[in-house]
Regions:
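Helix-adjacent hinge/juxtasegments
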Residues: 51, 56-101
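Short secondary-structure boundary segments
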Residues: 8, 35, 82, 123-125
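Short, functional N-terminal and low-complexity linear motifs
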Residues: 12-19, 77-78, 110-119
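Generic beta-sheet signal
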Residues: 3-5, 29, 76-85, 117-121
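Conserved P-loop
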Residues: 2-73
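General N-terminal targeting signals
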Residues: 20-22, 46-48, 78, 95-97, ...
Length: 141
């Protein structure tokens, strides 16, 4: 099964996605983390998510770019969080795919889907935070 969980910032989508992933299988679980720890705010959010996942049986795999290189356990339940961060990383990181970001992400998701039993994907609802965006932001959206 593949599920997409979307919502605004701090909307509870992470907790919902974790609960869904846990309910899908008692087998191996893998959390693919895409947020880079750029600053104190990011590090604090990452720590909160780690604490929230504690005791739920998730192995964590950090993957900031190149999702197709991520190798979760066969037949596992994978929680990919979050596609919005992954897109920003692919578009703007020096080691990202740049203009090939969409293709890189789609291929990465396809690769995960072939390998895992269940895939839960988390993404931000990008238009919940405003309606007027500059050129680079529109390209990202």
């Amino acid at each position: 099964m593949t599920a997409l969980v979307i919502g605004g910032a701090a909307s509870g989508k992470s907790a919902f996605a974790e609960q869904l992933a846990v309910s899908l299988s008692d087998g191996p679980r893998c959390y693919i983390a895409t947020m880079q720890p750029f600053d104190d705010e990011c590090r604090a959010r990452i720590q909160r998510h780690r604490e929230q996942r504690a005791g739920k049986g998730f192995a964590t795999l950090e993957c900031f770019t190149g999702l197709h290189h991520a190798v979760p356990p066969e037949k596992s339940t994978v929680l990919l969080e979050c596609v919005s961060n992954l897109a920003a990383n692919e578009l703007y990181s020096p080691d990202g795919a740049g203009d090939g970001a969409v293709e890189a992400i789609v291929e990465g998701v396809r690769s995960l889907r072939r390998r895992c039993e269940h895939l839960v994907i988390v993404s931000n609802e990008v238009f919940s935070g405003g309606s007027s965006y500059a050129g680079d932001t529109l390209h990202y959206l």
